[in-house]
Amino acid sequence: MDPCDCAKTGTCNCGATCKCTNCQCKTCKKSCCPCCPSGCSKCASGCVCKGNSCGSSCCQ
C-alpha cells in the first residue's frame, strides 16, 4: 500500500485510476482507495474509484 496525504489534505490521488476527494483514508492502493467520495455512503473493500466517484458495484 502506498501512503497518501488524504487524512491531511482531504485528497487522495494514487495512480491514474484512484482519486478520492474529501475522504478520510490514511493509506491507499494504486488502483483502489479504501474510502468513498462525498455522496458515497459506503465503499466495499477492493473497489476502484474513477475520477471523483465510485462505480455502482462499489457503492453500497
From Swiss-Prot:
GO terms for molecular function: metal ion binding. Keywords: Metal-binding, Metal-thiolate cluster. A divalent metal cation 3 binds at residues 14, 18, 23, 28. It holds the Pfam family Metallothio. A divalent metal cation 6 binds at residues 36, 40, 43, 59. A divalent metal cation 1 binds at residues 4, 6, 20, 23. Metallothioneins have a high content of cysteine residues that bind various heavy metals. Belongs to the metallothionein superfamily. Type 1 family. This is Metallothionein-1. It comes from Cyprinus carpio (Common carp). The gene is mt1.
